[in-house]
UniProtKB/Swiss-Prot annotation:
Compartments (UniProt record): Cytoplasm
SUPFAM superfamilies: Aldolase
Keyword Cytoplasm applies: yes
Cellular component, GO annotation: cytoplasm
BP term (GO), one: 2-deoxyribose 1-phosphate catabolic process
Family in the record: Belongs to the DeoC/FbaB aldolase family. DeoC type 1 subfamily.
EC code(s) of this entry: 4.1.2.4
EC class (word): lyase
Molecular function per GO: deoxyribose-phosphate aldolase activity
UniProt xrefs under SMART domains: DeoC
Protein role: Catalyzes a reversible aldol reaction between acetaldehyde and D-glyceraldehyde 3-phosphate to generate 2-deoxy-D-ribose 5-phosphate.
Protein name according to UniProt: Deoxyribose-phosphate aldolase
Active site: 94, 158, 187
């Protein structure tokens, strides 16, 4: 896979709490230069990223995060956060499921939590990726989380926040793809730093990669040609 091709899989990400305005502009410039699908930034930085990319007439989407990174805020708070991010120009929302509720077996709550965010996003033509945070889940819980995200109408399931105890694995991506089938997206994120790692995730079924190492991955793809 050539660099240009793999770039279109990448959400070029900076979710560091200390990311400055300059850091976000650099992220956007790299996304333009390398042709990444999207930038992924914290909600506070959505407006800046959207305005900057619009000024540059760039074909780069803006993704943001909801209930991040713990997923433990009430649904009403996630909905408020989602509305604000959409208002500021987000094209996609990566929301964290309520992991505790999932482990409680309160599947109605988990599903409704996702549904409410999906509803406000889809009203604005935005997509929702549901982060299940695989590092904290058993295989059964991973399967259930994917099923609930699919039932709730989400567009993608996503492995990880990158802030947990582990990131994406090929095995988890393969399992998630098997559960959601071909009609939903699967985003691999967390610890993906090389072209070889990104390619392995894509071969396992991911059709989006979340990484802060997008430049390195594309350069690696070019070197592999």
């Amino acid at each position: 896979m050539v660099g240009m091709d793999i770039a279109k899989y990448i959400d070029h990400t900076n979710l560091k709490p200390y990311a400055t305005k300059e850091d976000i502009i650099k992220l956007c410039d790299e996304a333009i230069q390398y042709g990444f699908y999207a930038v992924c930034v914290n909600p506070y930085r959505v407006k800046l990223a959207k305005e900057y990319l619009s000024e540059k007439k760039a074909d780069v989407k803006v993704a943001s995060v909801i209930g991040f990174p713990l997923g433990a805020t009430p649904t009403e708070v996630k909905v408020f956060e989602a509305r604000k991010a959409l208002e500021d120009g987000a094209d996609e929302l990566d929301m964290v499921i309520n992991i505790g509720a999932l482990k409680d077996g309160d599947y109605d709550y988990v599903k409704r939590d996702i549904e409410e965010v999906v509803k406000v996003a889809h009203e604005k033509g935005a997509k929702v990726k549901v982060i299940i945070e695989t590092c904290y889940l058993t295989e059964e819980e991973k399967i259930k989380a994917c099923e609930l995200a699919k039932e709730a109408g989400a567009d993608f399931v996503k492995t990880s926040t990158g802030f947990g105890t582990g990131g994406a694995t090929v095995e988890d991506v393969r399992l998630m793809r098997k559960v959601v089938g071909p009609e939903m997206g699967v985003k691999a994120a967390g610890g993906i730093r090389t072209y070889e790692q990104a390619l392995a995730m894509i071969e396992a079924g991911a059709n989006r990669i979340g990484t802060s190492s997008g430049v390195r991955i594309v350069e690696g793809a070019r070197n592999a040609e």
